[in-house]
Swiss-Prot record:
Domain of life (superkingdom): Bacteria
Subcellular location: Cell inner membrane
Protein name stated in the entry: ATP synthase subunit delta
InterPro entries: ATP_synth_OSCP/delta_N_sf, ATPase_OSCP/dsu
Gene Ontology molecular function: proton-transporting ATP synthase activity, rotational mechanism
Gene giving rise to this polypeptide: atpH
Membrane topology of this protein: Peripheral membrane protein
Length: 179
């Protein structure tokens, strides 16, 4: 995966510089849409077909996007460049890199919250608020339920993990007893 990230980074950075001149959120939406469309097996099949010109592939991709930016010259140039350089399959990684740049600019971060039980609105808001104080930045939560945690939560922000689950505590106790 590191290779894909390395190849995708310059594309994401270049697109981010373009997006800084306009609406970064709108560009983020466009990149996310492109990533979803580019993952479709049918699209990858058409993109790799020698019977379809690169211009036709770019037009197909742009037609599949709902974002109003898709009709702009900059978006067309970006998609055409990806098609010409056979980098359509990198679109999901480009989207990840673009989102990371956007978060860095906003002083925010994505947070993965795995809970043993579903979190309700007030609980989630309180948890996110306390995590924002701890990590000292704005957090964008993605919540997942995993009953194997038994209780508590496991929080991942970037490469930092905060595991307060019962399962983690039991594993720690087991390690201490067997050492």
């Amino acid at each position: 995966m590191a290779e894909l990230a390395t190849i995708a980074r310059p594309y994401a950075e270049a697109l981010f510089r373009v997006a800084e001149g306009g609406d970064i959120s709108a560009w983020s939406t466009l990149v996310q849409e492109l990533a979803q469309v580019a993952q479709l097996p049918e699209v990858l099949s058409v993109a790799s077909s020698p019977k379809v010109s690169r211009t036709q592939v770019a037009e197909l991709l742009l037609a599949a996007l709902k974002s109003p930016l898709a009709s702009g010259a900059q978006a067309k140039n970006f998609v055409q460049m990806l098609v010409d350089n056979h980098r359509i399959a990198l679109s999901p990684e480009i989207a990840v890199q673009f989102e990371a740049l956007k978060n860095a600019r906003e002083g925010a971060a994505d947070v993965q919250i795995v809970s043993a039980f579903p979190l309700e609105g007030a609980q989630l808001a309180e948890l996110v608020t306390s995590l924002e104080r701890k990590f000292k930045r704005k957090l964008k939560p993605a919540v997942e339920v995993d009953s194997s945690l038994i209780g508590g939560v496991r929080v991942t922000v970037g490469d930092e993990v905060l595991d307060t689950s019962v399962r983690a505590r039991l594993a720690g106790m087991q390690a201490a007893l067997t050492a």
